[in-house]
Amino acid sequence: MRIGDLKAVNDRYQMFSVFTSEQETDAKFIFSAKDNLTSKDFETKAGSRILEGYRPPFDATPIAKLREAGGFLSGKTNMDEFGFGTFSANSAFGIPRNPFDLERSCGGSSGGSACAAAVFDDHVSLGVSTGGSIVCPASFCGVYGLAPSYGRVSRYGLIDYGNSLDKVGLLSFKASDLRKFLPIISGKDVHDPTSMVQPNLALGKNKLKSVAIPKQAMEGEGISKGVMECFDSSLETLKGMGVDVEYVDMPTLKYSIPAYYVIATSEASTNLARYCGMRYGHQDGDYTLKFDDYFTSFRSQYFGDEAKRRILLGTFTRMVGYADRYYNKALQVREAIIADYKKQFERFDAVVTPTMPFISPRFDEISKMSALDSYKADFLTVPPNITGMPHLSVPCGYSEGMPVGLLFTSDHWDEDVLIDTAERWDKAFTVKHAEVSL
């Protein structure tokens, strides 16, 4: 389906929080962007009521670069509030619907971006990953999702969740779009001190020859039978491509979820302190209150439940007397996980697992999940994110008619291996397009 009547499309799939009423004319390509990337001609709300009405005066660097390359921004995509979620069900402005089954989630938190990539032809979408927010929805929606190395793409203009974790990346139905668009959005940016001087992408020069499968990731509870069948079939496809496959020990992976949520919530609680009803978005609180009372009242009214939960968790882990016990120890665990991956990359080109342990859940199933159930669902996507390493999800099969993803993680700055892998995979595996209708 091509972009035409965006309202009719969005009424059905709810992928956009806001979209253009203009028609593209001379644009070289059409793209969308997750709604936590600022854009000067659209509201930027990051899925939160507290930012409703906020119109930034500038474009985020990745959006600016795509526009400079001739791109037309079609809209801002729905997401979990500030990126806090696995299913894009924590949005104040619409929950995106999976194009394979409207009663199921698109994944999160870049669910709207994955939905747009799956529904529209010749469309690329910018996503943002903190703990799996690009590859999870890519898996659930049957598209390609690439999260680059931390520092590869500028974060200037990104509404932060976790400063040391956030990465801007790409989602598209076409594997070739990764090769086309990653060089455009990459590069050192004077506006972002976390962006790095980086080696050039050696696209086409480095190929996937060997992969490691961590035993600890595969032995854990929660991977469904259907996903395992697709994964086993994918390993045979890799072998047919001439790739060596070997199971390895990566004992630190079991600590990735607790370490990640300590780091992520700690950073989120500081980042969200600026939203107090005085500078951004809503500014209609009760000004007769004292500051602390105003601050508490306003944030209680406009933050969603998951945002409040993560603010409280992060505030606790940073308190005097607790920071060494939790936050600083989590940073040490992150270094141990990085070392575990580096050890594997001495012998292998990538580490491979399923992207998600199950197919996209139905919304009635999500409503019955506890917060802990939701957090635990990220156990395959968190490890590459906490390390800042580039990772890629490719569609690898279907279970109960829903897409299943295969996750490749490579060493820092080795996106060229992943992009080549995506293009080779695209030739070896027939990716199904969702049957889109209005």
Which residues does each PLM region occupy?
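Short, well-ordered alpha-helical
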Residues: 1-60, 80-85, 194-197, 202-204, ...
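Residue-level signal for inorganic ion chemistry
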Residues: 6, 16, 178, 211, ...
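A short helix-breaking turn/cap at a secondary-structure junction
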Residues: 15-18, 147-234, 297, 431-437
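Phosphate-coordination loops involved in phosphoryl transfer and adenosine-cofactor binding
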Residues: 28, 76, 208
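Glycine-rich, small-residue loops and helix-cap segments
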Residues: 34, 68, 185, 237, ...
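Short, well-ordered beta-strand elements within core beta-sheets of diverse protein domains
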Residues: 50-54, 166-173, 315-319, 408-409
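Short glycine/serine-rich loop segments
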Residues: 67-183, 387-397, 402-405
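Short connector loops at secondary-structure junctions
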Residues: 240, 244-260, 396
